[in-house]
A protein has these predicted regions:
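Soluble "head" domains of membrane/secretory-pathway proteins
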Residues: 2-17, 21, 39-42, 50-176
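Hydrophobic membrane-insertion alpha-helices, especially the h-region
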Residues: 20-37
Length: 176
């Protein structure tokens, strides 16, 4: 028998105690990795179609401290986590041309018109909210599915403190 912390431990239990110690260490490491460094978010809805589909799991980094245009980020708004793409950074100017394309600092950034010019009243209503200077400390976010306007076109720029991390990869998991 061997004494551990003043308690005598029979020899047959020593391998189990070593295993238990390794498991505790492993669980602590996993907690640190996924509680502090990384996170996993679930895509909810069709706002990021076709790139991120409803129900997909996305690995994101919580440690990201500098974002760039076109980064996909997880953010929180009104208690709900959502994914969106950064269209413009703080202090950049977002504008819309007469064909409905969004521009950042004078350069067309959207791959297609974000607002149809067929419905003139809707187009003019959206067009009249531009040009828009992104305030310091905020980001202008845009969904990949332009028909879903639940993004900065509707509620303005998002505070940097509401960005939870940068998407790194989708996780291909079945039947969850």
């Amino acid at each position: 028998m061997k004494k551990i912390a003043g308690v005598q431990i029979p020899e047959q239990f020593r391998p189990w105690l070593k295993l238990l110690g390794k498991l505790v260490f492993l669980l602590f490491a996993i907690f640190i990795l996924f509680g502090v460094v990384f996170g996993i978010g679930r895509v909810s809805g069709v706002a990021m179609n076709p790139n991120l589909k409803d129900g997909e799991l996305v690995l994101f980094s919580r440690m990201w401290n500098s974002y760039t245009n076109d980064d996909v980020v997880l953010y929180e708004r009104e208690g709900k986590s959502q994914f969106a793409r950064i269209l413009a950074l703080p202090d950049q100017i977002v504008d819309m041309n007469d064909e409905g394309y969004l521009m950042v600092d004078g350069v067309i950034e959207s791959s297609r018109a974000v607002v149809s010019t067929d419905d003139e009243s809707a187009f003019l209503r959206v067009k009249n909210s531009f040009p828009y200077r992104v305030p310091t400390g905020k980001y202008f976010l845009l969904n990949d599915n332009y028909d879903c306007t639940d993004d900065s076109r509707e509620y303005g720029a998002i505070d940097e403190k509401d960005l939870k991390g940068k998407a790194m990869s989708t996780l291909k998991v079945r039947n969850i």
